[in-house]
């Protein structure tokens, strides 16, 4: 990195860390029902909503009621979005007269946005109307983010409460999360993004003439959209001359803010945050990365404050930061070393393919690692154009169950599942009954934590294996060999871990990938969520056990190091064979 890039990266983390404590404290006050600066504004709104919906805010739920409420809430929103996509052609705010989605694509997209994945088998500006973007996708960006956050809060309550059967009230937690956290921050973020040049309008798309006409050859397609080939098997092409271009418009800033803040990631445009109307300047780029990490980072301090020991939260944050910074370093090194095949031609330099020059390599490295360490999935660089090792970094961060900050809420509760595993294994090694925050870790907690950690990994390997042996899966691959495997592995890793980014060389808009992806996203989201709630419910019922000489201190550096090793070892044991056949093999082939 040059001095400017070092300064940019260091300053970013300094500002982020400076806001972790005050923002984490604010979120703790919100979920504990304490007074905040926004209480005079939102308490009347909150109480009005409870009266309208018939919610008793003092009626706390056990883990089963909490889980059922969460599942019902998400089911209603999934069905509503599915219907909206099927009816898009007759709904308002559709100046381009875009048609309805096909049912497989509508199903995949509805589940994608409900689960906070935002996997997109369509191009936003070419397929989704303004009504769909605002009342469908943007609304789900709020609801899916709130769902993840409140599950994490319920998990914290399970750890800190004693001899209790209650984890809180899902409806109250979701209302407070949306009113006090997501809406105010999204408003501020949207205003800032508009100041940087992100568009916000309802104008029809603009058609403008080009200064110079452009001609090129493109493959001819049959009625089914399949490329036509001649007798020798070569693609049949036709000459096309372009004299004008269509520039898409839309209410982008309002959606861009919650897209990053809620670690959703679904782009208004197909190019996502590489598009200048979504992410126009280096400052907007840094700001969007900041939004991606803010809530997930702040929740670690929220956890420590609610647990009565803020060092517990700092320990988890240290683990997240250590792995994230390591990932940034490996990514930067791989991309700055360039492409070995290009270097053999005598052309040396960094790999800038698929990257935006206005962000540079440092801005691309920071964004790519942040968006895959969390469940965001937004991209400002094309991950399919990365070097094999550079591409393996975001893929590996996703495969680690996205605990490196992770999605809003999901990152923290998955990290807590890893903590339970680490405490249990350490207890076995020293011959002591494992304890965490004064609660004994027993068989139920281990089953639930293992389910939380391994569910997505099992889905990734099963669906990737199926895709590689079925013609329906292989036919969507535009690349063969090691890179083709990496594309399929990345796709199901992204969907199963609710990330949403992709190696774009894979055609996902097929019946096979729409349906298998929908199943992967559903199970990857809700199996760990219910398992965490079950674990929290069991822990809440337990009595407090005072620390003794044999208690493992979990708020100190040795445990943070042990937790880091457990995360990396679990990830390596699960996915190293697949990575060896994918990006590692591709890198070795390129270096021959």
Swiss-Prot record:
The chain crosses the membrane at residues 6-26, 67-87, 136-156, 179-199, 283-303, 312-332, 359-379, 389-409, 411-431, 450-470, 489-511, 519-539, 559-579. Pfam families: KdpA. Keywords: Cell inner membrane, Cell membrane, Ion transport, Membrane, Potassium, Potassium transport, Transmembrane, Transmembrane helix, Transport. GO terms for cellular component: plasma membrane. GO terms for molecular function: P-type potassium transmembrane transporter activity; potassium ion binding. It comes from the Bacteria. It is found in: Cell inner membrane. It is a multi-pass membrane protein. The system is composed of three essential subunits: KdpA, KdpB and KdpC. Part of the high-affinity ATP-driven potassium transport (or Kdp) system, which catalyzes the hydrolysis of ATP coupled with the electrogenic transport of potassium into the cytoplasm. This subunit binds the periplasmic potassium ions and delivers the ions to the membrane domain of KdpB through an intramembrane tunnel. Belongs to the KdpA family. This is Potassium-transporting ATPase potassium-binding subunit. It comes from Geotalea uraniireducens (strain Rf4).
């Amino acid at each position: 990195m040059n001095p400017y890039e070092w300064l940019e990266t260091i300053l970013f983390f300094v500002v982020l860390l400076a806001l972790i404590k005050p923002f984490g404290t604010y979120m703790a006050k919100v979920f504990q029902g304490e007074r905040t600066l926004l209480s005079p504004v939102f308490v009347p709104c909150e109480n009005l909503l409870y009266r309208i919906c018939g919610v008793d805010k003092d009626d706390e739920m056990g883990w089963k009621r909490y889980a059922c409420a969460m599942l019902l809430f998400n089911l209603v929103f999934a069905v509503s979005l599915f219907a909206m996509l099927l009816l898009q052609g007759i709904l308002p705010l559709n100046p381009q007269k875009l048609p309805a989605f096909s049912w497989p694509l509508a199903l995949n997209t509805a589940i994608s946005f409900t689960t906070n994945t935002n996997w997109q088998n369509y191009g936003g500006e070419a397929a989704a109307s303004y009504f769909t973007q605002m009342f469908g996708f943007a609304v789900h960006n709020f609801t899916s983010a709130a769902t993840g956050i409140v599950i994490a809060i319920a998990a914290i309550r399970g750890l800190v409460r004693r001899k209790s059967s209650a984890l809180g009230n899902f409806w109250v937690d979701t209302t407070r999360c949306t009113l006090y956290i997501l809406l105010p921050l999204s408003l501020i973020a949207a205003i800032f993004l508009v100041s940087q040049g992100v568009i916000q309008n309802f104008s029809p798309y603009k058609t403008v003439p080009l200064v110079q006409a452009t001609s090129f050859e493109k493959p001819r397609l049959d009625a089914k959209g399949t490329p036509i080939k001649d007798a020798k098997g070569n693609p049949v092409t036709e000459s096309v001359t372009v004299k004008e271009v269509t520039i898409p418009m839309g209410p982008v800033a309002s959606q861009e803010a919650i897209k990053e803040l809620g670690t959703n990631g679904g782009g208004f445009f197909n190019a996502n945050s590489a598009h200048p109307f979504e992410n126009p300047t280096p400052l907007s780029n840094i700001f969007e990365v900041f939004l991606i990490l803010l809530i997930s980072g702040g929740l670690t301090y929220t956890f420590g404050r609610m647990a009565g020991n803020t060092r517990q939260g700092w320990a988890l944050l240290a683990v997240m930061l250590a792995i994230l910074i390591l990932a940034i370093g490996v990514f930067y090194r791989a991309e700055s070393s360039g492409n070995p095949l290009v270097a053999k031609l005598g052309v040396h330099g960094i790999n800038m393919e698929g990257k935006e020059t206005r962000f540079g390599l440092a801005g691309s490295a920071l964004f790519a690692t942040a968006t895959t360490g969390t469940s965001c999935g937004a991209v400002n660089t094309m991950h399919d154009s990365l070097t094999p090792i550079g591409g393996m970094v975001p893929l590996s961060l996703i495969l680690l169950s996205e605990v490196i900050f992770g999605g809003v809420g999901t990152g923290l509760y998955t990290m807590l599942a890893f903590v339970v595993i680490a405490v249990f294994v350490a207890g076995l090694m020293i011959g002591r009954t494992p304890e965490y925050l004064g609660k004994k870790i027993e068989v139920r907690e281990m089953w639930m934590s293992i389910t939380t950690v391994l569910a997505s990994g099992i889905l990734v390997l099963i669906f990737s294996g199926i895709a590689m042996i079925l013609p329906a899966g292989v036919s969507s691959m535009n690349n063969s060999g090691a890179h083709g495997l990496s594309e399929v592995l990345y796709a199901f890793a992204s969907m199963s871990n609710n990330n949403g980014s992709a190696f774009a060389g894979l055609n996902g808009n097929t019946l096979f990938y729409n349906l298998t992806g929908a199943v992967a996203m559903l199970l990857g989201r809700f199996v760990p969520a219910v398992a965490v709630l079950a674990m929290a419910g069991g822990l809440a019922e337990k009595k407090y056990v005072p620390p003794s000489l044999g208690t493992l201190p979990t708020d100190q550096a040795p445990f943070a190091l042990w937790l880091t090793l457990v995360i990396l070892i679990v990830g390596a044991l699960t996915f190293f064979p697949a990575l060896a056949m994918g990006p590692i093999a591709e890198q070795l082939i390129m270096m021959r």
